[in-house]
């Protein structure tokens, strides 16, 4: 650990560092990040790019009295280091270890938990208004990336900031502009910021012009006053749109986001401003590590890697579900010109980069805008196209109203491909995909499927793209399950697949948890039990004919799902049995009413009781 960094053990210790040594401290922090994240994995590039911004905030502010909200939160590692948590970095994103995002229960310096995009300005505004109501004078800051500004919630908050301008109350927004979210940014805001980057600093320009005019004998001050009165037209001339100032937010920029002294000057000046102010800082994602600078997308979120080469320590040997989705969609689109693909700023994560390569005119990246993406897809479907929206399960939550109102009520053929469904591992509570059955399974007209393995997935996709109505397929993060490939009954609407006939108990497996259920069956067989096993396939509509057969045959029915039990598949089966006056014993296994913290997927399954050993044990306990 670096000599300077070793002196920082508590919040505000950075203030004891000599200002002339700030650049040295920045180097030590980057070295610390590389040493640790290369071993644990995590979000690297964004943190390397935010070192000086975070240092400047901790130099200018006092924690925990002052409040900083980090949008998305994956760039908060430096904040954690500077608030006394650096010794815990060996546990980053591991079970019972340091969280990869701000977490209120972890430190009082983490004033607001984040994980999803575009929330920081709203949260910071709430903190600022509460401050003013309590007549306090602490500083409130929102740190937001240029990618997050493509999210509609950010604009709603910017619009609402006028309440602070009216009262002349301070709040600082730092725009960390690195031209990227995870992938390169798209859309009008991206073009607007690109235009700003190409121009001289507006703040510097304004000050220099006013100073020069004031020094002209006789007429200078008069001209300066006239210029001030017509500042709106001057701004429009030199900075097209002046979006932020037109919304009542003072714009300060451009600032070099890697010049610690320039940042300190900007923040100290912003603290004195009456009203909301935005500091536009230009940064480089992956700054200080050549491998990340060259490929910031790869190092956005990465597993353990070799620091010298930048190569992952554990090389991918199997195809992932995302890979299978990507290859299948490209193949299906070859003979179906109506297939179009949509992503919300995640072409790489969702596997749509290959689709973009082959069918660029049928590919749409709408930015961080899930609500818009769903209704945009609905519009495409209304005109005869067959849109495929590939999205992470935890992010589709943001488009719930649009799924219900704009797609399902109108029975429009939108295909939702829900990646990262189920347990996702190290990203923790904010990214778990354990609610999609609950928030989609109750919507009329929605069809919801889950493949048991990689072989079944393309067949479900083919079925979905021939289906004339709303349909969704959920699948997990990680390598495909290759077992049970000999079981490949045709995919039919609302029909499940019987894997094993049995006698004592039947297990209904939802999706890729089949891997654990098949192992559990083997454990039970070894102990003398005769379990049946069913691949549910269709969560909605349920295979009611098969359920009647199972209820007549098996005294114990077990459902297993990587979903919250409340509103999950098990409750659907329970409702069916009750409605039809069956009295079978029902055991539902899944996530039992808690947010799943960061750990490995295997550890999370064990905690939930849905690993093979736990499933078998629960069944034996229930039968005895």
Protein language model regions, located:
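Long, well-ordered, tryptophan-enriched scaffold segments
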Residues: 4-5, 178-325
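Cofactor-binding active-site loop characterized by glycine-rich and histidine/acidic residues
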Residues: 43-167, 321, 339, 343-344, ...
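Glycine-/acidic-rich phosphate or pyrophosphate-binding loops and their flanking alpha/beta elements
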Residues: 265-268, 300-301, 320-335, 351-357, ...
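N-terminal amphipathic, basic-rich helices that act as targeting or association modules
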Residues: 1-81, 245, 249-263, 280-283
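A glycine-rich helix N-cap at a beta->alpha junction
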Residues: 88-98, 163-178, 201-204, 408-420
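Non-catalytic terminal/interface segments that mediate subunit docking, oligomerization
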Residues: 67, 283-397, 402-412, 469, ...
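Structural signature of the thiamine diphosphate
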Residues: 223-291, 413-418, 437-486, 612-624
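Peripheral docking tails and interdomain loops at the edges
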Residues: 304-308, 312-317, 425-427, 446-447, ...
């Amino acid at each position: 650990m670096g000599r300077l960094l070793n002196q920082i053990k508590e919040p505000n210790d950075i203030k004891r560092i000599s200002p002339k040594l700030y650049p040295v401290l920045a180097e030590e922090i980057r070295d610390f990040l590389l040493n640790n994240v290369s071993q644990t994995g995590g979000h690297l590039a964004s943190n390397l790019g935010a070192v000086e911004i975070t240092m400047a905030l901790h130099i200018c502010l006092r924690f925990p009295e002052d409040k900083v909200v980090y949008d998305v939160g994956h760039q908060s590692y430096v904040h954690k280091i500077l608030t006394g948590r650096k010794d815990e970095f060996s546990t980053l994103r591991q079970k019972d270890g340091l969280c990869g995002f701000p977490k209120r229960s972890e430190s009082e310096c983490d004033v607001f938990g984040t994980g999803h995009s575009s929330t920081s300005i709203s949260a910071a505004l709430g903190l600022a208004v509460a401050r003013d109501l309590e007549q306090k004078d602490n500083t409130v800051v929102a740190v937001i990336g240029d990618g997050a500004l493509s999210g509609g919630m950010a604009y709603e908050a910017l619009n609402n900031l006028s309440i602070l301008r009216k009262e002349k109350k301070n709040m600082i927004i730092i725009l960390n502009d690195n031209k990227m979210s995870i992938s390169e940014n798209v859309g009008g805001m991206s073009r607007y910021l690109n235009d700003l980057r190409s121009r001289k600093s507006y703040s510097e320009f304004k000050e220099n012009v006013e100073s020069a005019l004031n020094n002209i004998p006789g007429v200078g001050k008069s001209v300066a006053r006239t210029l001030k009165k017509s500042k709106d037209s001057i701004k429009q001339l030199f900075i097209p749109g002046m979006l932020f100032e037109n919304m009542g937010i003072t714009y300060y920029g451009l600032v070099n986001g890697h010049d610690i002294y320039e940042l300190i000057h900007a923040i100290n000046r912003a603290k004195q401003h009456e009203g909301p102010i935005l500091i536009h800082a230009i940064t480089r994602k992956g700054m200080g590590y050549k491998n990340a600078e060259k490929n910031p997308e790869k190092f956005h979120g990465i597993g353990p890697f070799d620091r010298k080469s930048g190569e992952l320590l554990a090389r991918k040997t199997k195809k992932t579900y995302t890979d299978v989705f990507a290859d299948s969609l490209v193949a299906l689109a070859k003979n179906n010109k109506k297939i179009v693909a949509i992503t919300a700023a995640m072409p790489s994560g969702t596997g749509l980069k290959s689709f973009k390569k082959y069918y660029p005119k049928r590919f749409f990246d709408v930015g961080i805008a899930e609500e818009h993406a769903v209704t945009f897809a609905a519009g495409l479907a209304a005109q005869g196209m067959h849109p495929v929206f590939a999205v992470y399960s935890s992010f589709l939550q943001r488009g719930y109203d649009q799924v219900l109102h704009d797609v399902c009520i109108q029975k429009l053929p939108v295909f939702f491909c829900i990646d990262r469904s189920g347990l996702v591992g190290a990203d923790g509570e904010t990214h778990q995909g354990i609610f999609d059955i609950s928030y989609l399974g109750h919507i009329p007209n929605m069809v919801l499927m889950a493949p048991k393995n990689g072989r079944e997935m393309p067949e479900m996709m083919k079925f979905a793209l021939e289906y004339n109505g709303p349909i969704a397929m959920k699948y997990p993060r990680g390598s495909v399950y290759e077992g049970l490939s000999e079981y490949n009954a045709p995919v039919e609407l609302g029909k499940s697949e019987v894997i094993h006939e049995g006698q004592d108990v039947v297990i209904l497996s939802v999706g890729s948890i089949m891997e654990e259920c098949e192992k559990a069956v083997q454990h039970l067989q070894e102990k003398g039990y005769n379990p049946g096993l069913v691949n549910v396939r269709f969560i909605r509509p349920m295979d009611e004919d098969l359920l009647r057969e199972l209820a007549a045959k098996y005294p114990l029915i077990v459902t297993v799902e990587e979903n919250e039990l409340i509103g999950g598949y098990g409750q659907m089966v329970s409702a069916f049995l009750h409605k039809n006056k069956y009295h079978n014993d029902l055991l539902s296994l899944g996530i039992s009413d808690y947010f799943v913290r960061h750990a490995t997927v295997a550890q999370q399954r064990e905690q939930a009781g849905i690993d093979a050993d736990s499933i078998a044990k629960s069944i034996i306990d229930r039968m005895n």
